[in-house]
Amino acid sequence: WARTGRGAVMAAAAETVESPLMRRYEGAAQGRGVAADGWRVCLAHSFEELRQPYGAGDVPLRDVLRHVGLALRYFRWWVKKTCIEKKTAFIDLLCAVPLQQIYGCPLGGIGGGTITRGWRGEFCRWQLNPGLYNYDTVIANQFTVCLRCKGQTIYQQVLSMERPSSLQGWNWGYCGHYAFYHALYPRAWLVYELPGQQVVLTCRQVSPVIPHDYKDSSLPVAVFIWEVENGRDEDVEVSIMFSLQNGMGTKEDGSGGHWNEPFTFQKDGERVAGVLLHHCPAVNPFTLAISAREKAGTGVTHVTAFNPTGLGREVWQDLLQDGRLDSPAGKSRPTEKGEVTAAAVCASCRVPAHGHKMLEMALAWDMPCVHFGSKEKLHVRRYTRFFGSKGDAAPALSHYALTHYEEWERKIEAWQNPILENSQLPSWYKSALFNELYFMTDGGTIWVEVPPDCCAEDLQGPAGAGLSHLLPVLREYGRFAYLEGQEYRMYNTYDVHFYASFALIMLWPKLQISLQYDIAVTVVNEDVQPRQYLMGGQTAQVKMKNVVPHDIGDPGDEPWQRVNAYLMHDTADWKDLNLKFVLQVYRDYYLTHDSLYLQDMWPVCQAVMESELKFDTDNDGLIENGGFADQTYDAWVVKGHSSECPTFLMLLSFGYGSMAELLGDTEIRQKYMDILNKGKEAFERMLWNGGCSAMGNHTQLAMCPLGRSGSSLDHGALWGMGEGRGNTVFPKSHILSALRTIFEKNVLSFAGGTMGAVNGMRPDGVPDTSSVQSNEVWVGVVYSLAATMIQEGMVEEGFRTAEGCYRTVWERLGMAFQTPEAYREKKVYRSLAYMRPLSIWSMQLALERRAGQAPAPTQLPQGYTHP
């Protein structure tokens, strides 16, 4: 990226100023091997602004009156779901997750569950049951350091600022002014300067999240590498104790029947020792494993079981006495009802004066077979392909992690370094780009195998999708799903995935292809069961044939089998879902050159194209809005001709016509080029006003030819570059004019240009409040808008626009590793930990395209005729 823009260089230079998140750091230590770029925060930092989730009290009176019917229908449905059926709502508008400004990098790979570790070192967000979260900080889950000189313990400290009511026999209250956290996902560092001890600890946390890797990236493991630097004039014995409670901090931990046992695992001359914590609920039992690597000069000891709700003096004194644990043999007894158990592993070594040593520890979990909420089908996770599905893989997983993490780090650095070493890119962007990838693992993500006895007919559905490569793709790469958001519990929400899919197609393209095959199957199938939709109260079938679904299901039900968990609108009438499928097929082919995929998707694209044409009611090449919220902005009503929905058919025609050309179907290509040309003429005549499209008295992201700054033309600009011809849907001058208008009004005129782009802005500089969504900033949409700006040469403006969102979310509001869907200028946010901000990878694609790094499309083999 030799020329990414003068503004980016200036921004990078400006970031040499100390981060506001590090102002309370009083230590001198910088840690060992800590990355230069990323998100860094002193453990003593506190965020001054604490926002509240959007609630009923934030709804203007006019909207309350407008949506009385919705409120009554939702409340009736909510009571039935939560009080009678004893299930949780797919979107719980009455009990939003409260904001906790504590989260750091999640642990674990893709699809095997995650355990999030906070930036102060706590274990605080759990998603082992697929798609279902609990937010309990488990106080017993800690690292403790013991220092000994000349046979005497001189320092023993829990590396936590907490002062809990349990385990009061331990030494709590570490001074956070002498430690900091640094995240560059999938790695993180915690640096502790031990006051008065001349010893610095650097804990490097590594999870196996590796682009284009479909084995190790699936593993439910994380490694903690403790780098110990001894600044003393004498040797020091250092012990690190890792304690862990059996369970996830829920009531189930005390349900009884859980037990622990020590283990050793030796292979290829490498030995690992630790404790297994067997957690035995009726549904989705699992085993946790804590372990350390034994090697010359490193000893590993353990405590099999202790009471984490008591004083903890026995464990503390055991470590204090000699820097070791007693290592009893044999299993612990199963817990009684109401009893909770925990275990600990300790790694010890001698560090020479002014020297350095390393201790390696791991956390693994093995929940190989899972039920979703309905408990109808048993699903086997991806990692079981390599480690078995019997529930006994935790020792092997631990050993594999501790003997392969160095290889993982080499691959991670080879992937990240070209971006990190590019001085043209601002540091905040490097942090955002990699840290937003947390959602790939911590988005309720599930990655499962298809059953070995599964046949194509089982996957195709009753209608028979006719996808010849469906079975080979799913057999080789499994099925992948992630939530719209941790609070919006629907898998593979397609209008949102449209934005986020850049991360998948650029980093794990086979998962994107697998996901698309699953969507294609649902397109040609239907679910005729009637149900009432909450927004309008009308009754319609769950899923119509030949339209793209909203989502592939709720983890509280049975995903893939029952789709469209979204109950607010009948999305068969949404205008954007079909567009987004066709454009993704075209984009995926363009970036992967997978001609077999394109051939398989072609008839499905034909089906959704025919469904989309019915929305052009006057045959002018433009789609008319239906007078209701009929696209991804599901609470923002536009009537008649806006500029968003009309562009849908134009983009569809462009993308579909380009695919037809690739497949040699000249008749289809000509048909849709005619529709495109007709639509362009009508758009110019009816909607273009010279600076942005006609929008009455508003300048809205929705109303410019970008199409809500992300849901159409910005991605069209990125995806519609077939054969390198550039965007042929709109004149370059129109696109630049629209982008400049948006930048001036929606970015610079909102919050002083420091919070990204507001969805809607009036000409007088006041955010549009006509809808609950019009005066929100949607982070993922803003990243997409920034990508479009970069694509069109407005590099400085693109970075400025996106930077506002990053600074707001990560530095001001304390929402690291839980980027919300939306926030307003003041007071509120909506939907923490949301999928759409993965769209920041569209910025990276735009940068690579500008540098000429994006691949050129590959033509299909000679002689191929379309299906």
Where are these regions (language model features)?
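Aromatic-rich carbohydrate-recognition surfaces in CAZymes
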Residues: 144-149, 154-157, 166, 230, ...
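Short, solvent-exposed loop/edge-beta patches enriched in aromatic
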Residues: 106-115, 119-121, 135-141, 145-155, ...
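Active-site core of glycosidic bond-cleaving carbohydrate-active enzymes
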Residues: 493-524, 603, 636, 651-666, ...
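Active-site acid/base region of carbohydrate-active enzymes
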Residues: 175-189, 198, 266, 270-330, ...
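Solvent-exposed N-terminal domain segments of exported/luminal and surface proteins
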Residues: 13-34, 91, 96-101, 105-106, ...
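Acidic/polar, glycine-enriched structural segments that form the non-catalytic walls/loops
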Residues: 12-88, 189, 194-197, 202, ...
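A generic secondary-structure signal for well-formed alpha-helical elements
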Residues: 114, 118-119, 230-236, 244-252, ...
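Non-catalytic C-terminal accessory modules of carbohydrate-active enzymes
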Residues: 122-124, 130-134, 138-204, 211-214, ...
